């Protein structure tokens, strides 16, 4: 067995038999990781189940964060083979919704969002519902913005006199005069199809125009209505022509209010995401005919440690799984999707186009770099950040989220950290002329000490007074092996020391393939060192960030010194006991653990000593400390 404490051992991979991984099929499908209690902790999809699952176990030392912890808990795996990647995507989405596994990114369930439906019946109605049924109706949504949905409905109602009643308007019922017109007819909100005052053919013409409008085809709707208006005028049907003229004017005003965002008239969806700690928000801009039709947003949790690419893939896939109609010509993305996710999305879009019975076409996936298109991405990202901030504020008001520590926010800004450092770990060393060398690690979570996560290290490889070697050992032991699984990885590491200590820390993290921000804090003058700058800098004395770092450093120093003094005292006491002939080091340690101090051993009676160490040792001790009582 390798006794070297600096050996970079692989993280544990749970109790999953690896021969089970080797026997998995190479088919597309869904895999479920289970823990020792049989609970599903992660669900994923794959084009090739064996290759995807094997990737978790092939190089476990390259894993980090939540993935590393998850792999350490895998005890079993269950797979479901599907006929295609798209089928696997649909199944994965449904299973995640149902089971809500601990390590999956969870999007807010779309069953809470409303859809707009044009019913499949004579004289169709336009309704708002939260349940999608495959009954031949035409569906639009989901709408995450309730205000946007109300605005659309009000606008449609102001232009097109569509019925709002629940009557069964079959030709037989109408011809028998079964119904009478309601108030909507008298206030010009309905044309009275219930009494046969409007034919079904005329009514369906309005439905066609409404469908175009909901798809963002405002120009096509205006052209169609204009043609009909001119036709009525030629036939001297001036009342009908005037009615259409009013509708056209309203549509033109509506179109003018829509912001033009691209110089061409292509239909596009634009996606961006933002995340902070364990929450995220995805935003999609719906652009039709070059105009911004509206936006939707999807909120996520359990996002900590998940890459932007994976979050974006989750949002885009979920959006097109749930969205009815409105498929664009092109999709703009904040960043490239992982290759397999991109292929799955392309296949999903093809299947949706086929299911709608439309002509086969390719929807392009693009990451704009320059110009007005890149500006759209930037605008979408800013919206995602803004909505996420509002979402977090609301969570705080509801008591669902901790209010962020001002020092943490200041640290994130000053150090340009990728996220708020909600977990910070600080390391310090202590020794006396190279003896009793110890290190301490303290953890602050949400700006407060979490003493259950403190760790102390009795160093094993350091020779003499070598603080760099001490820092190398303690960081290696903390971030490799079982400790790396026991404790979550921090968002920031602080080492007590200057450039040399910081350089040592960076080397250790690089060797362990860990991407964790790290800084050094020099003693006394409070200078902060960062890896990519040669000169240190000072924080203002009033900065909450400086106050927090000082608390961390002082706590790590206190913890290290306390442990060092304890070891040194024990060693001194052990030396006194081991001068007694017949008392070895192990016996001395055992006695100190039992009594707590040499003074208590010195004053103990024979029976107490006998109970702790046996007859022979008790006699030796009593004779040593009570020589005058002999004879």
From Swiss-Prot:
One of its GO terms (cellular component) is cytoplasm. One of its GO terms (biological process) is SOS response. Keywords: Cytoplasm, DNA damage, DNA excision, DNA repair, Excision nuclease, SOS response. Disulfide bonds: none annotated. This is UvrABC system protein C. Residues 26-105 form the GIY-YIG domain. It is found in: Cytoplasm. Belongs to the UvrC family. The UvrABC repair system catalyzes the recognition and processing of DNA lesions. UvrC both incises the 5' and 3' sides of the lesion. The N-terminal half is responsible for the 3' incision and the C-terminal half is responsible for the 5' incision. PROSITE patterns: GIY_YIG (PS50164), UVR (PS50151), UVRC (PS50165). Residues 219-254 form the UVR domain.
């Amino acid at each position: 067995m390798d006794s070297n404490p600096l050996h970079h051992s692989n993280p544990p991979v749970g109790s999953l038999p690896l021969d089970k991984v080797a026997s998995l099929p190479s088919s597309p499908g869904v895999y479920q990781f289970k823990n020792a209690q049989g609970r599903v902790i992660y669900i994923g999809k794959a084009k090739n189940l064996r290759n995807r699952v094997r990737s978790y176990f092939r190089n476990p030392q390259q894993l980090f964060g939540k993935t590393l912890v998850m792999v350490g808990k895998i005890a079993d795996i269950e797979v479901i083979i599907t006929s295609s990647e798209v089928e696997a995507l649909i199944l994965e989405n449904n299973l995640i919704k149902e089971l809500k596994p601990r390590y999956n990114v969870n999007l807010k369930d779309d069953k809470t969002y409303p859809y707009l439906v044009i019913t499949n019946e004579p004289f169709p109605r336009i309704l708002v519902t939260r349940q999608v049924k495959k009954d031949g109706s035409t569906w639009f949504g989901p709408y995450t913005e309730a205000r946007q949905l109300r605005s659309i409905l009000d606008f449609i109602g102001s232009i097109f006199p569509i019925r709002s009643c629940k009557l069964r308007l079959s030709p037989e019922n109408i011809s028998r005069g079964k119904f009478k017109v309601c108030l909507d007819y008298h206030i010009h909100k309905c044309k009275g199809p219930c009494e046969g005052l409007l034919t079904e053919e005329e009514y369906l013409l309005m439905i066609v125009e409404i469908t175009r409008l909901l798809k963002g085809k405002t120009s096509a709707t205006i052209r169609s209505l204009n043609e009909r208006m001119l036709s009525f005028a030629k036939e001297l049907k001036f009342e009908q022509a005037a009615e259409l003229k009013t509708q056209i004017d309203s549509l033109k005003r509506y179109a003018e209010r829509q912001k033009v965002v691209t110089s061409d008239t292509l239909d596009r969806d634009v996606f961006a995401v933002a995340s902070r700690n364990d929450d995220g928000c995805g935003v999609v801009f719906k652009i039709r005919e070059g105009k911004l039709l509206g936006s939707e947003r999807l909120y996520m949790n359990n996002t900590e440690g998940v890459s932007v690419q994976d979050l974006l893939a989750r949002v885009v896939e979920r959006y097109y799984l749930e969205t009815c109609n409105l498929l664009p010509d092109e999709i703009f993305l904040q960043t490239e999707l992982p290759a397999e996710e991109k292929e799955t999305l392309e296949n999903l879009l093809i299947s949706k186009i086929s299911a709608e019975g439309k002509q086969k076409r390719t929807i392009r996936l693009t990451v704009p770099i320059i110009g007005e298109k890149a500006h759209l991405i930037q605008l979408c990202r800013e919206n995602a950040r803004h909505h996420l901030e509002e979402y977090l504020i609301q969570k705080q008001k509801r008591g669902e989220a901790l209010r962020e520590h001002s020092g943490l926010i200041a640290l994130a800004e000053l150090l340009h950290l990728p996220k708020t450092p909600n977990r910070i770990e600080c390391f310090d060393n202590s020794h006396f002329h190279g003896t009793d060398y110890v290190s301490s690690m303290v953890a602050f979570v949400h700006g407060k000490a979490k003493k259950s996560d403190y760790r102390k290290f009795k160093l094993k490889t350091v020779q003499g007074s070598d603080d760099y070697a001490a820092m190398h050992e303690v960081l290696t032991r903390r971030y490799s092996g079982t400790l790396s699984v026991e404790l979550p990885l921090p968002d920031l590491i602080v080492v007590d020391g200057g450039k040399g200590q910081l350089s040592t820390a960076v080397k250790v993290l690089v060797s362990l393939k860990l991407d964790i921000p790290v800084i050094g804090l020099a003693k006394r003058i409070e200078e902060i060192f960062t890896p990519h700058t040669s000169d240190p800098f000072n924080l203002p004395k009033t900065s909450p960030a400086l106050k927090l770092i000082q608390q961390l450093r002082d706590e790590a120093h206190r913890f290290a010194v306390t442990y060092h003094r304890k070891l040194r005292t024990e060693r001194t006491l052990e030396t006194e006991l081991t001068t007694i002939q017949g008392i070895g080091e192990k016996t001395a340690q055992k006695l100190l653990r039992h009594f707590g101090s040499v003074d208590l051993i010195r004053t103990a009676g024979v029976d107490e000593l006998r109970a702790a160490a046996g007859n022979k040792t008790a006699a030796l001790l009593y004779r040593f400390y009570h020589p005058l009582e002999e004879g």
